Amino acid sequence: MTDQPRSEPLARRDIDVLVLGEINPDVIVRAADPTPSFAQIERFVDSIDLVIGSSSAIFACGAARLGLRTAFVGVVGDDPMGRFMLDALRARGVDVAGCRVDRDVPTGASVILTSGSDRAILTAPGTMPLLRDEDVPQALVARARHVHVGSVFQLDALRPRLAARLGAAHRAGLTTSADCNWDPRETWAGGLWEILRETDVFLPNAAEATRITGTTDVEAAARLLVDAGPRVVAVKCGKDGAIAVARDGTLTRVPSLAVDAVDTTGAGDSFDAGFLAGFLAGRPVLDCLALGVAAGSLSTRGIGGTASQPTLPDAEAAARAAGLLP
């Protein structure tokens, strides 16, 4: 890791969230039953859309939509899909000047088969795992208040240096967060426990939390994870809302928000953005959970992860209407 330049005082830093993560588009195939039939059988579906994909990019768009000044560091290929992603992120207010274009590897992509309530995902990784520690511009770190890492298990080149990267961020006065997302190898290791020691907010879903810890109980999993070092572990539980366990052992629960869901792609990433919007504003864990649930739920009203992401006033209003906020 190269030496960091002197960081600006917190009050003068002009990036609220610096996102380190993967970047790729999604091709969303939507139907009541999107299961394909082989033997050259053609089936008609409701829609096929090319949209902003990748958990980290969806998170970044959600954070920007909520009013956080957001910058992104990732890798794309020198191809139409990479240009599509960079242009789409810029259009949503995300600073992508720190992204690297790889001339040799194509941009990754995911095909998502969704019925609205559930989905299957096929992914060609491409440039997704190629982000390296040396790709992170130190000038951006010096301007940031917070570093968020998306899809820890997919960032193969960065992951071995990630604990050190987050530790350096802490020493420079930043706070940190991470979402692991699903481990495609299903080993649930890869240095995660060391990374958690340098993570202030950890944001897995229920399936990920229980797989990582080898437990079947979500609350027990959250307690094991928070013991590894985070200030708070917030676990997304789908229709059951979300829970959080703080370092002092306090458990907080928030129920789900009823919406007419069209597509659940990226709902967890929008939850992360809502939770961190509260965290960075110094709000209590209950408020952070409520904002996360509201942001995640409202994001499901449109196709793709970003089309229906709410503003902060929209998320707060929805949370209040549901009794999640006073």
Regions found by a protein language model. Give the residues of each.
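Glycine-rich phosphate/adenosyl-contacting loop at the front of the ribokinase-like
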Residues: M1-V75, P80-D87, A91, D260-V262, ...
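Conserved phosphate-binding/catalytic region of the ribokinase-like
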Residues: T2-L18, V29, A168, V218-P326
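A short, aliphatic-rich alpha-helical micro-motif
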Residues: R12, L140-A144, L196
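Active-site metal-binding loops of divalent metal-dependent hydrolases
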Residues: I23, V152, S270
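Conserved phosphate/ATP/ADP-binding segment of small-molecule kinases
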Residues: L166-T175, N181-R253
